[in-house]
Amino acid sequence: MRLLAGFDAGQTHTRCRLSVVQNGVHQPVGEGEGPGVSHLDAPQGERRFLEAISTSAQEALKNHPDGVIQAAVVGASGIEHGTALQQRAERLVGQALAIGDDTGLTKVLVTGDERTALRGAIPEGAGILAISGTGMIVLGRDENGHEHRCGGWGWLLDGAGSAFDLGHQGLQLTLRMADGRLPDHPLRLQIWNQMGCDSHAAVK
């Protein structure tokens, strides 16, 4: 069975969906999950990327031992479109998907996960998409097909609006309340209870 593989590779986890094309329509036939990725230049970045792709693909192939991935598209956190980093990631995907003797892989595309998400949600025309997770990025497209990105600098530099950043700022507010630097508020107990903490010592 000749398969198409689509990957959503974020910093927390990676998903793989396999499909076959029948009468011009993609029919999903399997899904798998693996660990997250980090920037390729980060310590162990390439190893993590390889592991994320290979693990999620093998999980998705469990029910299709004779399946051969013919083409793969990866939307990955931290990949800039049109850069040497993109080419490097595409070579790594080829390595990760060299499964068995008959690899069959003829086409690989790796790009930023914001681009695959925008095309998946809004294939044509104007639109805008925001991703808020470990990091944050926004991608917009106008009526002429021109795209513009905002954010995507990484959580250490600028994670404004990311789920991590919002949670971090909320936790910081509760610490100021505990210190008396801010008036106490029910939000402090709500956040601490969600964390399973019943005192300032437990927060540490």
List where the protein language model places each region.
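Short beta-strand-loop/turn "lid" adjacent to the catalytic site in phosphate-handling enzymes
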Residues: 38-41, 57-97, 109-110, 119-122
